[in-house]
Amino acid sequence: MSYQFPDNLNYADTHEYVLEEEGLLKIGVSEFAIDQLGDIVFVELADQGATLEKGETFGTIESVKAVEEVYLPFSGEIVSVNESVIDNPELLQNDPIGEGWLVILKPESKVSIADLMTSEEYKSKVMPN
């Protein structure tokens, strides 16, 4: 399979992507990681308004193969939750980088996106050949 690694995304070691938009962070899971999970059957996400610390779990993704937790790459308040993904988990599988985003985070302080991997660095990690 051919995966997308858009240049405007940065990635955490745990396969979450971050898109910085006007001081907010749109967070989802990479196309590569979603493909590894197989058919997604259930998505659970933290509540809007929840304040979480970097590294804390903000949700779980259940597939026919496994249940995986998703982690925040930065501390902050969840200001939006993608209810569409909860109602229709296939969105996450079919379009993880577009309609399948998970949450929008208002970081508690200025974040350095450079602390995360660039698209090229992430691609080299998950597809070393």
UniProtKB/Swiss-Prot annotation:
Claim: Ribosomal protein is one of the keywords in the record: no
A Pfam family matched in the record: GCV_H
Coiled coil: none
Domain of life: Bacteria
Cofactor note (record): Binds 1 lipoyl cofactor covalently.
Domain Lipoyl-binding: 24-106
Cofactor (UniProt): (R)-lipoate
Ranges that cross the membrane: none
Residues where N6-lipoyllysine is found: 65
CDD domains: GCS_H
GO cellular component: cytosol; glycine cleavage complex
UniProt KW keywords: Lipoyl
Single GO biological process annotation from the record: glycine decarboxylation via glycine cleavage system
Function: The glycine cleavage system catalyzes the degradation of glycine. The H protein shuttles the methylamine group of glycine from the P protein to the T protein.
Family indicated by similarity: Belongs to the GcvH family.
Subunit architecture: The glycine cleavage system is composed of four proteins: P, T, L and H.
Entries under HAMAP family matching the protein: GcvH (MF_00272)
Protein name: Glycine cleavage system H protein
